[in-house]
Amino acid sequence: MLSPEILEYYERGGERERLTAGAGRLEFLRTWDVLTRTLPPAPARVLDVGGATGVYARPLAEAGHRVHVIDPVPEHVAAAGALDGVTAEVGDARDLPERDASADAALLLGPLYHLPDRADRVAAWREAARVVRPGGVVVGAVISRFASLIDGVAKGYFAEPGFVSIVDRALGDGVHRNDGSVRQWFTSAYFHHPDEPAAEALEAGLTGVRTVAVEGPVWMTGPRLTEFLADPRLTGVMLDMLRRIEDEPSVLGASGHLLTIARRHA
């Protein structure tokens, strides 16, 4: 279900701590903020497709939701299934082992940026639409087309010649291809232009589609971001400001990640 370099990246824990500090922590807080405003009230049945080790499944279960994780990595499934209130199984976002209209909401927070072919991404959206009830919500996360360019400057990756060609291709067709030889770079992925995820969701038959910026441009601020996140008051101010501009089209391309929210036709 996953290419060898992607599977190896996750098996060695490439994402295990990513959402705990810095820009990763901001990504988590903003994603959680959007979810709390988007998902139906608890107790709802939520399918967390590509939910990995349960970084979002855990707080969703703690909030009273019934959460089922479906992920292609067996180690992820074992970790998520060990969480209180969470069940998990191995599966593919393009062919979910779920009955029609069996969930209140479906999350695609991991699969879409590992499906380089548009047809596969639309299939994942279509499957998510199939398994939620009429009127149910689907939320999908993607990586911005320009994320590797920005990250390469912020982290100094452009000093290494191999990174230049990776970014050059990503800017051209969205495909970020890392064969795993340079481990500090993200594994192979697809980076969406801000216009693409909504178009894919619409093609899959979903309605009420909107795309919001997750981190906005704030993720580029480095040490200053860490200072904000260490202060609960400043964190609250930052989250409030980002919420106010999350729909601003001119901000979407500067955000590291985007969330697209849609519903199955009622």
Language model features with spans:
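Conserved class I S-adenosyl-L-methionine
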Residues: M1-A42, V55, P59, A79, V137-A170
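Class I SAM-dependent methyltransferase SAM/SAH-binding core
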Residues: L47, G54-D95
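A short acidic, Gly/Pro-enriched loop at the edge of an enzyme's catalytic core
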Residues: R94-A106
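A short SAM/SAH-binding and catalytic strip from SAM-dependent methyltransferases
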Residues: D104-A119
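Acceptor-substrate binding/catalytic loop of class I
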Residues: L115, S181-D195
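A short glycine-rich, Lys/Arg-flanked "PGG" loop and its adjoining helix->strand segment in the class I
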Residues: V122-V137
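C-terminal lobe and adjacent flexible extensions of AdoMet/dcAdoMet transferase-like proteins
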Residues: E200, A204-A266
